[in-house]
Amino acid sequence: MKIHKHAPMNGVIHIPGDKSISHRSVMFGAIANGTTVVKNFLPGADCLSTIDCFRKMGVDIEQKGTDVVIHGKGLKELKEPSDVLDVGNSGTTIRLMMGILAGCEFHSTLIGDESIAKRPMQRVTGPLKQLGAKIDGRANGEYTPLSIRGGHLKGISYESPVASAQIKSAVLLAGLQAEGTTTLTEPHKSRDHTERMLSMFGVKLDEDEQSVSIEGGQTLKATDIFVPGDISSAAFFLVAGSIVPNSRIVLKNVGLNKTRTGIIDVLKQMGANLEINEVDAKGGEPYGDLTISTSSLKGIEISGDVISRLIDEIPIIALLATQAEGTTIIKDAAELKVKETNRIDTVVSELKKLGADIEATEDGMKIHGKTPLQGGAVVSSYGDHRIGMMLGIAACITKQAVEIEDTDAVRVSYPNFFEHIEYLTKTV
């Protein structure tokens, strides 16, 4: 796809439903007793993979666009799949599914695409094995395909070496099926969508700032879920509104969960002109309307605990930093190396092609601004949706046209991303 320099971005858009919450709404609805209705579901490729996996285990799921109805019969009624469970490109699906399957008394095999085959799973299979799950795979359970035979689990206390919502969620979902209490402690709090939604489904948890405990044997009761807009998707247009001259964009019903709003903190610190109007907190998840307009920005250091609250937004933050006066340093973000791509390397290589003054570091990157981006280059998403969208926004401020390869990757989390660019600028 070739994108030319655009006019100012102005308008009101509804950001697609949150990917993390959409995944969990299907998973928890599938293992609950009763019918769960989900509104504003994200019909992206990743979340559709989650639906497909549960259908293969006998769960009746109706999906029409952003509406999903899940007819759950409880954990014990999941059926042994006759085929492999293919998670596609979805790391959330495979890691949370492992937690569910760890306690199911049948055999299952999890596979994914080429990207998933390269992503490390030991960080999840390790604690699940401690609970008693039988999991095997390439490199002793490090890589897919993963073979799981669930069964009797016993609660554990586990200290996670990293703050990861996927590790935490997998352990809690296994702990739900274990004998006794399971406790997970992490270095600092990761996103808490699992805890919020389990509570919505009637599960009791014991939480403090860095740990969460769950008592095994609890059952989930069906409920209705409203999925707010995904702040990780909103981040692309928050940055666009900040750096495209003479722009003003309103983003409706965006999730404002405090464990996800690191991008808002960074924008404010850099001097962005951002207004927040909190609207509601349906389903335990706060959301509101965000208004962003063009402003002068300054470079900052981004490191420490905030990284886990904005890890998925770092590619677009890197673009933001190219248009800020001074140097922006991103540290403590080595987790980027094991995403859909090595996002440190891909962000640096692709932005350099456009003329950015950016360099990779061991655990992040250093960006010197303010730098006019030239464009006139061919860049690629390398199959990574967040890289593809970052490049789409970058092309809105380059002096020359930019050709982006593999733009289909954005369908994973934001199927109408380029349509929203077209609407806001009236040209693509």
UniProtKB/Swiss-Prot annotation:
Chain positions recorded as phosphoenolpyruvate binding sites: K19, G91, R119, Q166, R343, R386
Active-site residues annotated for this sequence: D312 (proton acceptor)
Gene Ontology terms: biological process: amino acid biosynthetic process; aromatic amino acid family biosynthetic process; chorismate biosynthetic process
Superkingdom of the source species: Bacteria
Catalytic activity: 3-phosphoshikimate + phosphoenolpyruvate = 5-O-(1-carboxyvinyl)-3-phosphoshikimate + phosphate
Keywords tagged on the record: Amino-acid biosynthesis, Aromatic amino acid biosynthesis, Cytoplasm, Transferase
Any GO MF annotation of the entry: 3-phosphoshikimate 1-carboxyvinyltransferase activity
Cellular localisation: Cytoplasm
Main localization (coarse): cytoplasm
Residue numbers binding 3-phosphoshikimate: K19, S20, R24, S164, Q166, D312, K339
Entry keyword annotation includes Coiled coil: no
GO cellular component: cytoplasm
InterPro entries: Enolpyruvate_Tfrase_dom, Enolpyruvate_Tfrase_sf, EPSP_synthase, EPSP_synthase_CS, RNA3'P_cycl/enolpyr_Trfase_a/b
Enzyme class: transferase
EC numbers for this chain: 2.5.1.19
Pathway annotation from the record: Metabolic intermediate biosynthesis; chorismate biosynthesis; chorismate from D-erythrose 4-phosphate and phosphoenolpyruvate: step 6/7
Pfam families the UniProt entry points to: EPSP_synthase (PF00275)
Annotated family: Belongs to the EPSP synthase family.
Role, per record: Catalyzes the transfer of the enolpyruvyl moiety of phosphoenolpyruvate (PEP) to the 5-hydroxyl of shikimate-3-phosphate (S3P) to produce enolpyruvyl shikimate-3-phosphate and inorganic phosphate.
Protein name: 3-phosphoshikimate 1-carboxyvinyltransferase
Organism: Bacillus pumilus (strain SAFR-032)
